[in-house]
Amino acid sequence: MRPIPRTMSTQHPDNATVPEWAKGDVIEGEAEVIEAYYAFSRLNVHEVMWDAEGKDVDTHVVRKLFSSFDEYFKNNILGEDIFLTYRLPNPKIEGAERKVFAETMESIPITFDVAERFYGRKVVPVFEVILPFTTNASDIISVARYYERAVAMEENIELQDGVYVRDLVGEIYPKRIEVIPLIEDKDSLLNTRNIIEGYYRAIKPSYMRLFIARSDPAMNYGMLTAVLLAKYALSEAGKLAEELGIPIFPIIGVGSLPFRGHLSPENYQRVMEEYEGVYTFTIQSAFKYDYSEEQVKGAISHINREEVKEPRILGEEEKKVTRDIIETYTLSYQPVIESLANLINTVALHLPRRRARKLHISLFGYARSTGKVMLPRAITFVGSLYSVGLPPEVIGISSLGKLNEMQWNILEENYKFLKNDLQKASEFINPEGLSTLVSYGYLDAEISKKLEEDIKYLESMGVKIGPRSYETKKHALLSQLLMLSLKEKKYNEVKQYAREMAVIRKSIG
């Protein structure tokens, strides 16, 4: 059995601070190749996700890593000791990226040829791909079959009498790849069992990896819903692994701020305890670059060494109650977000850009959708709300007042660190923010009342509201200045204040 990585470095653009080796504010091109090497060699991350979704991808990354850092990769075998995993565009959803999907798949045999020359033996450096927006088993079965039949088996095509493709390009390896479903929407996360089981029945892998989204579900349905969906999916995967008799290794996509998962060098131990059953944690850019390298390395080393706990398996009654809580919370959260969409999209334009990303216009492309409105990517969504002193963790929380005692007990058992996450976020509430937004015309008075109810409910839970430290007090003042600058159309100042606040938070969003 190949080693399964405990940590996966990603290219999420949530870092407020730019690393020293980046040549500008945006990490792109050759800098991302350097970043992959840095993650492996300096931070001791086990796996790097190479993102072909929503941006120009460099399919020659393996060749560049070997040629630039040959000594390191001679001693650390790519595909055996450390791992590079492609994140594909989903060809069913991102129509303009279909050929990028094909190009990325076609590059996998090239990486094999490069590695064979480099190591002097057959080494498969890339053999797993991640498919975003997976909604059913057919999605991932199609990707696995596409590689087998349209890439690996093209060597058998006869070009003319007795002349085959393999005579021109050589034999194609690997013959098959593993596909990791990245499950991002509520219905699909609740349907995790059928997605995994359908793939297993069709492909018969010896093990499976499952990628549970944490950011997009939070943006679309609220933080509490996202946590419960993750727990539900982990339970279903754990139960199915026992039934099928194959190991299933879940990955969770977590960022530094509570809304996006709260995995930071300061809070990683709680996150590992929260998400029992998770094998691989994403190490996103804010984790890597907004803390000291020593702190980052220490946290990653601890995650790499920590024993994996068994997932908590939910009983049928617990599953039903969890679904009920999810519906209650989501119904309270979504209407507020729809009302805030214009404000969020306006502020999002002025947040720092850290990666080269092609914005897509389609409903389920990179402009993400919740209900009836368009929203930016999750990172800028979160950053926008923090920048006006309204952390999204707060939104909809008063709906918990509708829960009975049994529902509360199940919630507390399945979201251990709810109060801790809310307390961290609540320090960034600007107590004057709501009245400022209403007076400037950015917030409807009715929605302001709903948000005030959420804040009062937090206080009833024993959560302290508003800034207490020098840094969080400074953050509140900067959010006031940002709102004033926005009103006066002084956009350079808006950008400056947004950047300063992101540095204080140690994450854009």
Swiss-Prot record:
Q: Which reaction does it catalyse?
A: oxaloacetate + phosphate = phosphoenolpyruvate + hydrogencarbonate
* SUPFAM superfamilies reported in the protein's UniProt record: Phosphoenolpyruvate/pyruvate domain
A Pfam family found in this protein is PEPcase_2
Gene Ontology MF terms in the entry: magnesium ion binding; phosphoenolpyruvate carboxylase activity
BP term (GO), one: oxaloacetate metabolic process
Going by the UniProt record, its keywords in alphabetical order are:
Carbon dioxide fixation, Lyase, Magnesium
Cofactor(s) demanded: Mg(2+)
Q: What is the role of this chain?
A: Catalyzes the irreversible beta-carboxylation of phosphoenolpyruvate (PEP) to form oxaloacetate (OAA), a four-carbon dicarboxylic acid source for the tricarboxylic acid cycle.
Q: How does it assemble?
A: Homotetramer.
Q: Which family does it belong to?
A: Belongs to the PEPCase type 2 family.
Name it.
Phosphoenolpyruvate carboxylase
Source species:
Metallosphaera sedula (strain ATCC 51363 / DSM 5348 / JCM 9185 / NBRC 15509 / TH2)
Upper lineage: Archaea, Thermoproteota, Thermoprotei, Sulfolobales, Sulfolobaceae
Which gene produces this protein? Answer: ppcA
